[in-house]
A protein has these predicted regions:
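AMP-binding/adenylate-forming catalytic domain of the ANL superfamily
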Residues: 480-502, 521-536
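Conserved AMP-binding/adenylate-forming
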Residues: 12, 38, 53-101, 422, ...
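Conserved ATP/PPi-binding loop(s) of AMP-dependent carboxylate-activating enzymes
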Residues: 340-344, 353-386, 423, 466
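AMP-binding/adenylate-forming catalytic core of the ANL superfamily
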Residues: 98, 117, 369, 374-375, ...
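Conserved pre-ATP/AMP-binding loop-to-beta segment of ANL
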Residues: 13-14, 28-29, 154-172, 179, ...
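Conserved AMP-binding/adenylation subdomain of ANL enzymes
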Residues: 191-208, 216-257, 267, 271-275
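Gly/Ser/Thr-rich phosphate-binding loop
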Residues: 252-260, 270-333, 346
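Conserved AMP-binding A3 loop
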Residues: 41-43, 168-195
Length: 537
């Protein structure tokens, strides 16, 4: 099964930094970026980009250099990002909440010329800056910015003759299955995605968009930041997410678009439940969208009841800049489909024989279009393993297509084969998440005696209690025998990556250890100590 969504996006600028130019000419005094410490109009944003570009040049940044920007959502982060791109250097976008080990691995791999840290807005960025011995400088409108030492050994990458095909951002994947890979996204990749997002959601200059998804990740970069700037809208920056603050900001500033993850929406649900709030309705809010992780029906239904509006669903990967499919505002859905393919993107589903599967059957999802990455940095073999000679990118995700709408079934690597039958973790998770005591769950496979078992990890609500036995009985009412968990482990909080995704590789290790030590949940509590179950921005 193969399908192609047409795209008529018109001319795009050459560089991501050029998106502000039309609005400086049309509406220079329109608010562009707003944060707690102040705001920039489009005129001020353009000036900040120009001044930062000059500053970076003085600090030895050259075209083709990799420039690490360690930070969180802020005017400083945006200015550094767009100024670096305008110099034809590569912005290496790094979430400040990464560990020291993760950050240092990226620094070594990319061979950064310099590292900059948004120290005013981010405690974690300030800690990294101190650890690296960075100098601190005050920048107007940006607060304090850490400046790492110049790497004299850094060698610039050659520039592509076509500006639009040059690397506009280097984003390292969260690495839930191993070492992170550097995804090279071009100006075309990001601008195609941003412009298409504007068109699909009909974003206009009067929109006020809540930027809580980290701009160091693909969704926050293209779908939130660049799409907002292309549309001439106003972006309200938040470096972290707190349900109480979010409620105040959504109401006070009359925000119109909210992009979140299932974890963020679950926090809002828990906030409402703890305060016995049955309705969170904001008159100005017109679109709410979930992406970044699978959305289960229980969460979708609860959020829609709370907000009094449809929760849209999207799906993508960093390598695809990132959106592959999304539900449309004009065609709301009551299920958990991720909707049709993004405009201008081709999709096809292949079976194990690498041939297209019939409509309605599960296949491995392949994607082709202007959103597909240039490749993995310094990893040509890994790039060739996922992008074929015809430009098809293998997502390694399993999906089915019904009436032009995609449903993600699970990841190829996560597929559990039990008694010869396929078990898709997402299906089991959806059932468990329907229990009133469950905040979220994660299902992994465990090899035992030549077969695989289904192991479920469950995070419970602070208000409602349950037991593994009760949850097993609940799941048994909706799942056939081979899909039922062999073991259910209750955890204080799910381990997550810096992108807020559940770290299933870590859970799989716990599942294997659990059977070796013959425990019944205590091991999970010991290995996975309580942590804040929040999306790390």
């Amino acid at each position: 099964m193969s399908i192609h969504q047409s795209s008529d996006l018109g001319a795009l600028p050459s560089r991501i930094s050029d998106v502000v130019v039309p609005w400086v000419e049309r509406s220079p005094d329109r608010p562009a970026l707003i944060e707690a410490s102040g705001a920039w109009t489009y005129r001020q944003l353009a000036s900040a980009i120009s001044e930062t570009q000059t500053w970076l040049s003085r600090l030895g940044v050259r075209p083709g250099d990799r420039v690490m920007i360690v930070g969180e959502n802020s005017r400083a982060f945006v200015a550094l990002l767009l100024a670096t791109a305008s110099l034809d250097a590569w912005p290496v976008l790094v979430n400040a909440r990464l560990s020291a080990r993760e950050l240092d691995e990226i620094r070594t791999h990319c061979g950064a010329r310099r590292i900059f840290y948004t120290t005013s807005i981010s405690t974690q960025a300030a800690e990294h800056a101190k650890r690296h011995g960075a100098a601190i400088e005050e920048r107007e409108g940006c607060g304090s910015v850490g400046i790492g030492a110049l790497n004299e050994e850094a060698v610039p990458e050659p520039l592509d003759a076509n500006i639009a095909d040059r690397v506009a951002a280097l984003i390292y994947t969260s690495g839930t299955t191993g070492l992170p890979k550097g995804v090279m996204l071009t100006h075309t990749n990001l601008l195609f995605m941003a412009a298409g997002s504007v068109k699909v959601r009909t974003v206009i200059p009067d929109d006020r968009i809540y930027a809580i998804l980290p701009m160091s990740h693909a969704v926050g970069l293209s779908v939130v930041l660049l799409a907002s700037l292309i549309a001439g809208a106003s972006l309200y920056l938040s470096s972290s997410f707190d349900p109480m603050s979010a409620r105040v900001i959504l109401e006070r500033d009359r925000l119109t678009l909210l992009f979140g993850t299932p974890a963020i929406f679950n926090q809002l649900l828990q906030y409402a439940k703890m305060r016995k709030i049955s309705s969170l309705k904001f008159p100005a809010l017109r679109v709410i969208t979930s992406s970044g992780a699978p959305l289960d029906l229980a969460t979708k239904s609860a959020v829609e009841a709370l907000f009094g509006m449809v929760l849209h669903n999207g799906y993508g990967l960093t390598e695809c800049a990132p959106t592959i499919a999304l539900t449309r505002p004009e065609a709301p859905r009551s299920d958990i489909s991720i909707g049709p393919a993004f405009p201008g993107v081709e999709i096809q589903l292949l079976g194990s024989d690498r041939q297209p599967v019939p409509a309605g059957e599960v296949g491995e999802l392949q994607v082709r279009g202007p959103n597909i990455m240039k490749g993995y940095y310094r990893a040509p073999e890994e790039t060739a393993a996922v992008i074929d000679a015809e430009g098809w990118f293998n997502t390694r995700d399993l999906a089915r297509l019904e009436d032009g709408n995609l449903f993600i079934v699970g990841r190829t690597k996560d597929l559990i084969v039990r008694r010869g039958f396929n078990v898709y973790p997402a299906e089991v998770e959806a059932v468990l998440n329907g229990h009133p005591a469950v905040v979220r769950s994660a299902v992994v496979g465990r090899t035992v005696g030549g077969d695989e078992e289904v192991v479920a990890f469950v995070q419970l609500s602070a208000e409602v209690t349950s037991t593994p036995t009760e949850l097993a009985d609940y799941a048994a009412r909706s799942l056939t025998s081979y899909k039922r968990p062999s073991e259910i482990l209750i955890v204080p909080a799910m381990p997550t990556t810096a992108a807020g995704k559940i770290a299933k590789a870590e859970l799989k290790k716990v599942a294997e250890s659990s059977i070796k030590e013959g425990t019944n949940g205590q091991l999970a509590r010991r290995i996975l100590p309580r942590q804040e179950a929040t999306v790390e921005n």
